Amino acid sequence: MKKLLLAFLYLATAALASAWQQVNEDAPEPAREFRAVWVSTVYNLDWPSRAGLSAAEQKQELLAILNKAVQLKLNAVILQIRPNGDAFYKSSLEPWSAWLSGPGVNPGYDPLAFAVQEAHRRGLELHAWFNPFRATISGRPVGRNHISRRQPGLLKKAGSTTILNPSSSAAQQHVLNVILDVVRRYDIDGVHLDDYFYPYPPNHNISDGKSPAQRRAAIDSFVQKLYTGVKKTKPWVRVGISPFGIWQPGYPEGVKAGVNAYEHLACDARKWLAHGWVDYLAPQLYWRIDSEQSFPDLMRWWSSINPARPVWPGIASARINSSEDPGRPASEIDAQIDLSRRLARQSAGQLFWSWRSIGKNAGGIQSYLARRYTSYALPPAMPWSGRIRPARPTAQGRDNGRTISLAWQPVDSSARKWAIQAGSGRSWRTVCVLPGGQSKVTLPVGLIGNAARIAIRPISACGNSGTPAVLAR
């Protein structure tokens, strides 16, 4: 009797379920926008919350960041994995970071491998952020095989810190070896550098005997070699740099700055962008819209240099109601997101500094992000790094009234991720992004809503859209 009842229930459920069949239709291109947040590890600013936490505690904190990033509909996390000549990953070249479990102390797992796996599982990109030349910080211990102990001749004193001499070919080669080692061994989506090349004033006059022009030439050479090396190793890995927000005082006309990045930091970001030595530039436009360093004026200037490569501004959510800018409202960030979209020449994007302000909901920033990011978006493609477009998969779906189960079979292995879209007519949205190795998913009916079509679209490693499988009720 029990078996008969179970069989009846199964047949009843099957009868109620409706099929989604593949049809010979297309779907609009998914929305594109780079939506990233910096997760800083130096000084335990964002993660982990303090050094010495157990592996389980560190993982729990990182998963909370990734889960919240998905909830806010961000699509990339820029994780600092080399704060000062050390590593948040297993390395034969540099010691474990003191910001993890102590100087040179194995934390009991590989944080970068864990971050990559969990980010991809959630449809997020994971960009590895390197501080290229900072070596030691005053009063902070380092591991026994730290570069400052193995090759102290490569270091220069800069105030309370030491840096690898950026003009030294041996120092540059060490940094390149470190970064390319990560590119080869980890499935990262991007390599990211910040604004620290030569030190900021008043510590910029290190005793290297080089003129500002010679320093710039050295940094230019490093940036070019880095880009070439990454693209030769894995063309789909996105290379980005986030320089100081003003190239030089007076650019654009009338803009003032206490720091001359071109002279003091040997940072010629205009040249890197113009020559295509980066896949994107993220100038740190941390000022207000109505300040002397006007956000829109600076955004326009940077975007005009090379319209073929995107400029995505760094936006200072950390300055909401901060000591640096008392009274700055979260609405300022909201307005800057809007401006960055309207002024983008190539593609839109924003990078938020940093996770702490987002995670703590400074000034109610999360509600503003929810208003701007109403559906998921894919990071913009990089057709200059590869033009492969994945073929249409075969797919089918079942709807039992509560959930929709989708399954698909790819034609080849060129899909790095899948964008699941839902819509009718011209009204479509991306409801989730899945890793390339996944071939089925079960979604709540509410996520699809009244959409008459579902599209399962393959996305290549360089972000190119493939032909979707479209399903109809």
Can you describe what each PLM-predicted range is?
Residues 23, 28-36, 74-84, 108-156, ...:
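Glycine-rich, aromatic-flanked loop segments that form ligand/cofactor-binding clefts
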Residues 32, 40-60, 117, 127-185, ...:
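Active-site-adjacent "subsite" loops/lids of carbohydrate-active enzymes
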Residues 60-86, 185-190:
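Catalytic domains of carbohydrate-active enzymes, especially glycoside hydrolases
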Residues 87-102, 134-159, 196-213, 252-260:
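Aromatic- and acidic-residue-enriched segments that line the glycan-binding/catalytic groove
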Residues 125-137, 192-193, 215-262, 310-320:
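Aromatic-lined carbohydrate-recognition surfaces of secreted/lumenal glycan-active proteins
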Residues 269-270, 274-291, 309-384:
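Substrate-binding cleft of secreted/luminal carbohydrate-active enzymes
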Residues 402-414:
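Conserved aromatic anchor
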Residues 443-465:
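Beta-strand-rich modules
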